[in-house]
Amino acid sequence: MYNKHHKTLKLHIKKGDTVQVLSGNYRKKQGTVLKVFPKTYRAIVEGVHIVSKHKKPTAKNPQGTIEKVEAPIHISNLMLIESATSRPTRIGRKLDEEGKLQRYSKKTGEFIKNG
C-alpha cells in the first residue's frame, strides 16, 4: 500500500482545492476536495464516487438506513482546476520570493494560493 518509512508525502492536491476527475465512471466531473489521506494516496471529493452505506438497525432507528456517502478516490485520477482559467492544469513546485517551496501551474507559471 504505502512505504511506512517515508516521512512526509508531498501531494499535488490539498484540502479545499477544486479538482477534475481524469478517469473512471466520474470522468470530467469537478468537485472540491473534502479530505486527503496521504498514506494511501486517496482523497474524498465532493459529489464524486458516491456509494451506498448500510446502517444497522439500532434502538433509535429500528428500521436501519441506507446512506449515500462519498468514498475516497486515488489522487492520480485527480487534476487541479486553475481558478483563473477554470481548466485543469499540471502542478509543479518552485521557490517563491521568500524562499519557500510553493505550488505553481505548469500551464501559466503562476503560483497557486493555498486553501
From Swiss-Prot:
It holds the Pfam family ribosomal_L24. The keyword ATP-binding does not apply. GO terms for cellular component: ribonucleoprotein complex; ribosome. GO terms for biological process: translation. One of its GO terms (molecular function) is structural constituent of ribosome. SUPFAM superfamilies: Translation proteins SH3-like domain. InterPro entries: KOW, Rib_uL2_dom2, Ribosomal_uL24, Ribosomal_uL24_CS, Ribosomal_uL24_KOW, Translation_prot_SH3-like_sf. SMART domains: KOW. Keywords: Ribonucleoprotein, Ribosomal protein, RNA-binding, rRNA-binding. One of two assembly initiator proteins, it binds directly to the 5'-end of the 23S rRNA, where it nucleates assembly of the 50S subunit. One of the proteins that surrounds the polypeptide exit tunnel on the outside of the subunit. Part of the 50S ribosomal subunit. Belongs to the universal ribosomal protein uL24 family. This is Large ribosomal subunit protein uL24.
